């Protein structure tokens, strides 16, 4: 573990700053959109821009990295991300913000790709599982911390946007000053969607639906809380609890999925998330209950934590389930295909959720989450009836962030061994004849 931190501390520190800025930015824009009285559909459309950019970037960035190198690309797009957030405070318009969110999405997928290929290059077959675990803790932990920065200054002011830009710029310093040589970039081709569906229909469909869920969850939760008249501190607490509780639950739920049919664990988790989404609606105070049945926000926080514990491990569960049906040498290609499918769903999530909120009211946010989790669960029950589970000794649960790129998927210790540089053979000393 110490060796992992010693070799990659600059990268971990830089990514920590970036995720802190990312967590802060998401909550900041959501609350500011409510304060500016953007319509719900305009807000959902604007927030979806990030995932459009992420999807576009994932298709185009690998060629750019191959041409100009990791460090230049990282510096260029981290600078772009730092610049773009400042422009939000100058042009307060949902359609301008959509374009800016696209640019942010392109920048972030580029940064993830560079960071994860770098981590992959510095990992060995013995420690890549530890590297992935540390990476996940840093991503979720610093993102949660960033959400609390919402209390720094009112979202109506310029200061929060300046602070996000400063934190993003700080991420450049440890990366650019590292003495380590950048890795040789390796393009990874995802599994064709037709082959992926034939291999694991449940895995592919679940990834598509879960993309809509998670993109809406992380972009519109702050909007929902602001519409429910939560204080700024309560909004930051809500978003923090979502990230941290979901990260903590990855490992116990993952262990259960290794012990039982993974589809059963996914089905139970999705219906559990649907149930706790319903309880969150009831505890929100907008169910027009009699006074003696009214509930406090404390119960809402509890149900949100339980919802997150059921929902956020889903991406890792879907990847592990897909791997159950394929040989080890295809794990990385299948993971890239699952990530591509997840991205397709993510592009539509915020906009679809905003339509639910327009029709139902603020609690349409949780109605949307309930509905799509239930769809995954129902499809899972159907698939269990038409296909037997399999026992693949090469496949096991590995917690992975949904933002992971194909380069990061290779950190999964269950994939094929990565090529490590060979030590030069020792030449025996010359002897007298």
Where are each of the predicted segments found?
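C-terminal membrane-cytosol helix-exit motif in multi-pass small-molecule transporters
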Residues: 150-151, 165-185, 376-385
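Helix-loop boundary and gating motifs at the non-cytosolic
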Residues: 2-51, 203, 214-224, 228, ...
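Cytoplasmic helix-loop-helix junction between adjacent transmembrane helices
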Residues: 102-137
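Intracellular juxtamembrane helix-capping segments at the cytosolic ends
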Residues: 110-123, 312-326
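Loop-to-transmembrane helix entry/capping segments in MFS-fold secondary transporters
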Residues: 40-41, 125-135, 232-233, 326-338
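Helix-to-loop junctions at the C-terminal end of transmembrane segments
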Residues: 57-70, 154, 249-261, 357-358
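Structural signature of the two symmetry-related core transmembrane helices
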Residues: 72-86, 165, 264-279, 370
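Intrinsic disorder in cytosolic terminal tails and internal cytosolic loops
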Residues: 1-3, 185-190, 383-433
């Amino acid at each position: 573990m110490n060796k992992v931190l010693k070799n990659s501390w600059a990268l971990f520190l830089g990514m920590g700053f970036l995720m802190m800025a990312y967590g802060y930015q998401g909550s900041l824009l959501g609350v500011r959109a409510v304060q500016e009285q953007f319509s719900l559909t305009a807000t959902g459309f604007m927030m979806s821009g990030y995932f459009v950019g992420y999807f576009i970037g994932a298709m185009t960035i690998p060629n750019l990295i191959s041409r100009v190198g990791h460090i230049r690309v990282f510096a260029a797009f981290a600078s772009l991300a730092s610049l773009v957030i400042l422009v939000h405070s100058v042009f307060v318009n949902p359609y301008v913000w959509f374009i800016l969110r696209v640019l942010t999405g392109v920048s972030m997928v580029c940064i993830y790709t560079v960071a994860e290929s770098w981590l992959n290059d510095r990992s060995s077959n013995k420690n890549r599982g530890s590297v992935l675990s540390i990476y996940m803790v840093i991503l979720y932990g610093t993102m949660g911390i960033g959400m609390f920065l919402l209390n720094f200054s009112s979202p109506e002011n310029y200061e929060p946007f300046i602070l996000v830009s400063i934190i993003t710029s700080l991420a450049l310093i440890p990366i650019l000053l590292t003495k380590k040589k950048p890795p040789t970039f390796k393009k990874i081709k995802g599994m064709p969607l037709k082959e992926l569906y034939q291999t694991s229909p449940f895995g592919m469909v679940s990834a598509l639906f879960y993309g809509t869920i998670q993109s809406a969850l992380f972009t519109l939760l702050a909007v929902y809380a602001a519409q429910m008249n939560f204080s700024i501190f309560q909004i930051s607490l809500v978003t923090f609890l979502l990230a941290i509780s979901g990260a903590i639950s990855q490992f116990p739920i993952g262990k259960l999925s290794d012990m039982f049919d993974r589809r059963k664990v996914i089905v139970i988790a999705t219906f559990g998330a649907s149930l706790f989404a319903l309880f969150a609606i009831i505890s929100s105070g907008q169910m027009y209950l009699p006074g003696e049945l009214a509930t406090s926000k404390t119960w809402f926080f509890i149900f949100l934590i339980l919802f997150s514990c059921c929902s956020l491990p889903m991406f890792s569960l879907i990847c592990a389930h897909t791997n159950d049906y394929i040989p080890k040498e295809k794990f990385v290609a299948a993971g890239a295909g699952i990530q591509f499918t997840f991205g397709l769903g993510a592009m539509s999530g915020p906009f679809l959720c905003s339509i639910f909120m327009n029709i139902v009211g603020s609690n349409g946010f949780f109605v949307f989450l309930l509905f799509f989790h239930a769809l995954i669960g129902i499809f899972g029950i159907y698939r269990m009836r038409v296909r037997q589970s399999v026992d693949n000794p090469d496949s096991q649960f590995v917690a992975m962030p949904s933002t992971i790129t194909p380069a990061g998927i290779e950190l999964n210790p269950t994939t094929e061994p990565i090529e490590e540089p060979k030590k030069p053979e020792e030449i025996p000393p010359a002897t007298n004849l």
